[in-house]
């Protein structure tokens, strides 16, 4: 579903737009592909955060580098795909208006994930897993994709998608990481996230973990009521 050919020369994509007049783009946002392809064997499609059109005012950015909610919906339609749920992992509400998803009939869930530490937040992992399970178990959502994004659609996004693939779909950590990176079009950058994914696989197999996690997963649930609150506010 990507509007770019995947390659790892993304460091050479145009830079500097974040320093132009108007709202400041997120750091390094422009160097990553807007959206990956839906991951084979799953419902997931990873993408970087869409931005409100006001972020592009005064920057004279090429249209293909601008990326908003409407852009993603259009790309999905062109690929004969339908996104039914978007899970937003950014730790801010400043990038776009969440009501835009509802305007396109897409459910929206916000999980505030601080950068660099989602692997220590087992409560967020379980919230993510529960939300995805609830969505895929509803027959009304058959065939619909689940869009997942953080700021760059890479590290927090990759970690949580891979955790679902490991914990629920029984992928090995190696396969989950490789698949995510292939379909996202970029490698995960946080080595401690990758290490934590291998630890999660070991914990699932042997019931032991040498790492630490915070949060109380026993009290962590995502319900239809929470999804409703996210989409009605």
Swiss-Prot record:
GO MF term list:
inorganic triphosphate phosphatase activity; phosphoprotein phosphatase activity; RNA binding
UniProt-annotated binding residues for substrate: 151-156
Q: Where in the cell is it found?
A: Cytoplasm; Nucleus
In what ranges is there compositional bias, type Basic residues? 1-14
* Family, per entry: Belongs to the protein-tyrosine phosphatase family. Non-receptor class dual specificity subfamily.
Question: What interactions and quaternary structure are annotated?
Answer: Interacts with the ERI/DICER complex component dcr-1. Interacts with ERI/DICER complex components rrf-3 and isoform b of eri-1. Interacts with drh-3 and rde-8.
- In Swiss-Prot or TrEMBL terms, this protein is called RNA/RNP complex-1-interacting phosphatase homolog
Query: What organism is this sequence from?
Result: Caenorhabditis elegans
């Amino acid at each position: 579903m990507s509007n770019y050919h995947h390659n790892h020369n993304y460091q050479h994509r145009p830079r500097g737009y974040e320093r132009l007049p108007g709202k400041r783009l997120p750091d390094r946002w422009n160097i990553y592909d807007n959206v990956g392809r839906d991951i084979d064997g799953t419902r997931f499609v990873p993408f970087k955060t869409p931005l409100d059109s006001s972020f592009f005012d005064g920057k004279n950015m090429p249209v293909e580098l601008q990326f908003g909610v409407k852009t993603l919906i259009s790309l999905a339609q062109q690929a004969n795909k339908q996104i039914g749920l978007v899970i937003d992992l950014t730790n801010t509400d400043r990038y776009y208006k969440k009501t835009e998803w509802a305007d396109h009939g897409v459910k929206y869930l916000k999980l505030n994930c601080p950068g660099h530490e989602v692997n220590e937040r087992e409560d967020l992992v379980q919230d993510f897993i529960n939300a995805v399970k609830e969505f895929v178990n509803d027959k009304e959502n058959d065939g619909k994709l689940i869009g997942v994004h953080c700021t760059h659609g890479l590290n927090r996004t990759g970690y949580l998608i891979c955790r679902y693939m490991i914990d629920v779909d029984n992928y090995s950590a190696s396969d989950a990481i490789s698949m995510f990176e292939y379909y996202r079009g970029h490698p995960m950058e946080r080595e401690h996230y990758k290490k934590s994914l291998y630890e999660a696989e070991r914990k699932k197999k042997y019931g032991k973990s040498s790492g630490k996690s915070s949060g109380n997963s026993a009290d962590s649930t995502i319900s239809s009521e929470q999804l409703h609150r996210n989409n009605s506010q």
